[in-house]
Amino acid sequence: MPARMHYTVLEPSSTERVAIRGLEYNVRRWGPADAPKVFLLHGWMDTSATFQFVVDALRHDWQLIAPDWRGYGETTWLHRPYWFPDYYADLEALLAHYAPAGPVRLVGHSMGANIAGIYAGLRPQRVARLAMLDFIGLKAPADVDAPQQLGRWLDAQL
């Protein structure tokens, strides 16, 4: 029988509840408050806690901010079907709350990478750096105007 591995968390997160688009979002934070911000966006069937290993490696140099997406972890769950574009608007509202000015750094895993990548395409002026891990790209839309339509929808959510 293999030996059990034990991991010791080097820096536990602080958590806060933030009102985002009618939901109560759970957001974890690590690192110095005056350090440059990096937003960590978790994947499907996951939570913000999944980034703890990454956090322990980066915690001295960065302020790391990781939300639980709607319907995941400790963020409000809906009693209706989820619509994927809502995640783009949620990300925009989260960025407005935590980093209202200037471009941000996004790290997305799986579903979080898809959200980050589409958001970066819709709002390139808001994204300074983008890291996308373990993701499958979305199918190209048949309608060549789809990115502009989605951008107009996102503008209307503000």
Show where each model-derived region lies.
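Flexible "cap/lid" loop of the alpha/beta hydrolase fold
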Residues: 117-122, 128-158
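Active-site loop/oxyanion-hole signature of alpha/beta-hydrolase fold enzymes
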Residues: 18-28, 66-111, 115
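Alpha/beta-hydrolase fold catalytic core
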Residues: 1-38, 59-63, 99-102, 128, ...
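Conserved HGGG/HGGXW glycine-rich cap/lid loop of the alpha/beta-hydrolase fold
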Residues: 26-77
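Glycine-rich, phosphate-binding/catalytic loops in enzymes
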Residues: 55-58, 81-84, 123-124, 146-150
